[in-house]
């Protein structure tokens, strides 16, 4: 975590932290004004929101990075597919070398590597083989391609809360219950893209990492969610569900990590959560190498971590599935026996019924309305 991010996520920065962040206060004011103006233009219809021709469920958040949107998007897409829907996920494709519109998966299998699609689309395509994944900055264009070319009849807009150019039928906002707003400021003074009052646009709040939140904070967030949306929130925890090797093949039970000395490799917005997951699985983390979010690992970086892990007596270098898809496949396959990958999913603790009801309402709202029968002519 960089020095700036440390300032962002420290909820009580103290005098030194406040002093270090003071110069950014001048930049926060114009960002706040620009965000408010943009929101008002969408609210009043001056800036239009395009209808996709299919129900749209947006998964987003208020802060930058690390809230748990990807597991939530996986869960929502899987639930829609389980209802028989032809689902397509629309993603910005952060970390990709290309910025044009592209199809990462057509629903029959992955078509692009992470270097071209971005790590999150590549992961989503791998985890949801029956779901199409499209990526690019213009999500309305992606939606049109998904509906017209791929036959999608339900769309999941990944990281879409601020992307208001595409109309949606349900806005799901994911908050990290353990630290939802950081220092409370907007960019660049803090991590938030919008103030918490923007939650009034949401249809559902999803509290990730609810198991790590203090009881009094959890109650306050539940009240905030109900006040903003009229619904109780969904609550989840990040649960490790599988252990893979460097080639992303099953590699036995997660119990294999218990008591093992390991090196942790990650390129995440908030790597501390990954370290906590490893410790909860009983692993002894002898060293940790954290790179910036969406970082594409080079051969030299991977070799250095493997070498340092060997020197520290580590059985394996362990990384996340989101990081593993960014590794060069040939490099990862060559080091498959020395790498382990922990798969993490969102395990719902509360609110599964609330989520299902919200999806029901979104699908019903987007359903074509029958035309009234023509009136009989008056004789």
Curated annotation (Swiss-Prot):
Record-level Gene Ontology MF annotations: ATP binding; tetraacyldisaccharide 4'-kinase activity
Alphabetic keyword roster: ATP-binding, Kinase, Lipid A biosynthesis, Lipid biosynthesis, Lipid metabolism, Nucleotide-binding, Transferase
GO terms, biological process: lipid A biosynthetic process; lipopolysaccharide core region biosynthetic process
Pfam families: LpxK
SUPFAM superfamilies: P-loop containing nucleoside triphosphate hydrolases (SSF52540)
Family: Belongs to the LpxK family.
UniProt name for this protein: Tetraacyldisaccharide 4'-kinase
UniProt organism field: Anaeromyxobacter dehalogenans (strain 2CP-1 / ATCC BAA-258)
